Amino acid sequence: MTQDQLKQAVAQAAVDFILPKLDDKSIVGVGTGSTANCFIDALAQHKGAFDGAVASSEATAARLKGHGIPVYELNTVSNLEFYVDGADESDEHLNLIKGGGAALTREKIVAAVAQTFICIADASKLVPVLGAFPLPVEVIPMARSHVARQLVKLGGDPVYREGVLTDNGNIILDVHNLQITNPVELEAQINAIVGVVTNGLFAARPADLLLLGTSEGVKTLKAE
């Protein structure tokens, strides 16, 4: 199977997982990126089965609306049963690196609210140790140099992602060469740097379920 076919398979698996648990009042949290887009397209076939969605980015909101799915502001939603999103890396404990698409802050907020966080990814994203994929950090623009110096002290090699502004108007530093053996601790350390909005480690709030697309079919992993 191609990578696109794997993405479509896990997207459909996520729809199949949540659909029996939805009703006409349900609101679904939706992530950002190519795998999340596959989920949106699959979910749209059943848009009469739920009320609407909360989007983690402007791009996701536009795609949902294009399918005729109502999009709600998170502040108006009291209960979010599911959040479905892709990942750039996952370990066996379902700690994730996310943010390749620069939507990490809003993704992290929606994940924090959701009762169940379902990660959908192809098998190449499952790794023994996080960090081969550069860790994105969202930074207030005036703090860029300060934050970069602090990230070097933590052992990383931060690179400014040129030409990219987040939906919140901030910049991204991608931190290379990290061996992330304690993701919960590193997430907290980076977030404690003045000027950091958040970083792409989802470890304090990892995924609850990982639907992994493999050549043998979709495998379901739960956090160990």
From Swiss-Prot:
Gene Ontology cellular component list: cytosol
GO molecular function: ribose-5-phosphate isomerase activity
Catalytic reaction annotation: aldehydo-D-ribose 5-phosphate = D-ribulose 5-phosphate
Active site: E107 (proton acceptor)
Pathway(s) where this gene product acts: Carbohydrate degradation; pentose phosphate pathway; D-ribose 5-phosphate from D-ribulose 5-phosphate (non-oxidative stage): step 1/1
HAMAP family from the UniProt entry: Rib_5P_isom_A (MF_00170)
Subunit structure: Homodimer.
Record-given protein name: Ribose-5-phosphate isomerase A
Annotated organism of origin: Pseudomonas fluorescens (strain Pf0-1)
Name of the encoding gene: rpiA
